[in-house]
Amino acid sequence: MTKKFIGHLPNNDRFLLGNETVIDRQTGLMWTKNASLLDLPQSWAEALNTIKALNKSGHYGYHDWKIPNRKELFSLMSYETINPSLPIGHPFINVFSGYYWTSSTCARLPNQAWYIHLGGARVFKGMKYGSYMVWPVRTVENGNNSKLFQTGQKTCFNESGVVIDCLGTGQDGEVQSGFEFKKNRFTENKQIIYDHATDLTWLRNANVHQNPVDWNSAFNLASKMNIEMEYGHNDWRVPNIIELESLVDMDRHSPALPNDHLFNDVQDYYWSSTTSAYNMDYAWVLYMVDGAVGVGYKPLSEFYCWPVRGEERMIIR
């Protein structure tokens, strides 16, 4: 059965609180209740080794803890809250409003790994020798398959960016947690691309408006498309940041899209409809070269618009 995007569950239904752990029913992941369980920032290699030590000791009765991959940690993010950028009413404690490592390496610069800022939900990459926090997670159902899709990463690297054998590393490339969309994720019909993973429909031409625009102009362009029934439809819109990020493949770069994507003229930066909770003058942007998630100043014409159709989605399942 193909997993789909859905809206968020109510928070009182989403999180199941144990003594020291929290199960996220929306994703099938178990997190430590204490988001600073490991106390201090660590390098990426140190973090991977620390997780191995947790598993050896059977921490909280489990031997399959891991550093979350990028999609797993991203699944906790709320773009409506800050400090921390977690859902309102979440049950976690000691959440550090700074960067947390993921187990996913940057495909273009493999001496860097992805991390997410829990103060504001930015998704960036940094040198693996840097020191950041770690939040252990494990999958609670279907073996290694959470309700999320895999990141796409299938290769492992050391801190210098050299390819290594994945066995025993605990990296995203070894664990490959989640569902894999085997083939034919995208199909085309009259210059429109349907994404079977998300039920969203994108334009094949990822640069249909030819030039970068400011944020308000992106909405005006989508409205104009609807008035003129562009491509036979009148429900085009600017995608939210979670929908844009759903296209990213961690094994790819320039652009960071799945190998079988069918899109043309993909640009480096795209506006989302999601306003920054830190500063309403900024909106979230997807950086398509590597797949980073950052912000752009709304009045500046620096980013492109890639219209989408379909029921607005908030998280993958």
Predicted regions mapped to residue ranges:
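Glycine-aromatic-enriched surface loops/turns that form tight recognition elements
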Residues: M1-K66, R70-R237, I242-R317
